[in-house]
């Protein structure tokens, strides 16, 4: 497993592979998977966090099932661009995943992704209870969609 730049994604993907998006929280992990054409991000059920080893095994199972070739993970920078404790936790998570997968990771600035996801769910009239259950995967989909749009712009 390695960390790559968004510009390198296409050189790491094999035909038919997808890209995963992750929104790492303290209690949950939001997950999204791209379509095969790498144009649309699709949210998946939220993973309730347990112990790291168990989380890693459950994620790897999902990545294998979805034929994931690259993982885009949200980097929760502060609004001024500085790194806080959540950035350190995200980097540590990716570093710890080295023992479980060779799939490369891409860090993606996730500032305002949860707010955008919340607005989107509100516009769809999703109830407060359902929003709470879906917000992290919606944020993961927002993160992944931003990366997919960037990839499309790089290759057009």
UniProtKB/Swiss-Prot annotation:
PANTHER family: POLYNUCLEOTIDYL TRANSFERASE, RIBONUCLEASE H-LIKE SUPERFAMILY PROTEIN. One of its GO terms (cellular component) is cytosol. Keywords: Cytoplasm, Hydrolase, Nuclease, Ribosome biogenesis. Could be a nuclease involved in processing of the 5'-end of pre-16S rRNA. This is Putative pre-16S rRNA nuclease. The lineage of its organism: Bacteria, Pseudomonadati, Pseudomonadota, Alphaproteobacteria, Hyphomicrobiales. Its main location: cytoplasm. It is an enzyme of class 3 (hydrolase). It is found in: Cytoplasm. It holds the Pfam family RuvX. Belongs to the YqgF nuclease family. SUPFAM superfamilies: Ribonuclease H-like. Its EC number is 3.1.-.-. It comes from Bartonella tribocorum (strain CIP 105476 / IBS 506). GO terms for molecular function: nuclease activity. InterPro entries: RNaseH-like_sf, YqgF, YqgF/RNaseH-like_dom, YqgF/RNaseH-like_dom_sf. Coiled coil: none annotated. GO terms for biological process: rRNA 5'-end processing. The keyword Cytoplasm applies.
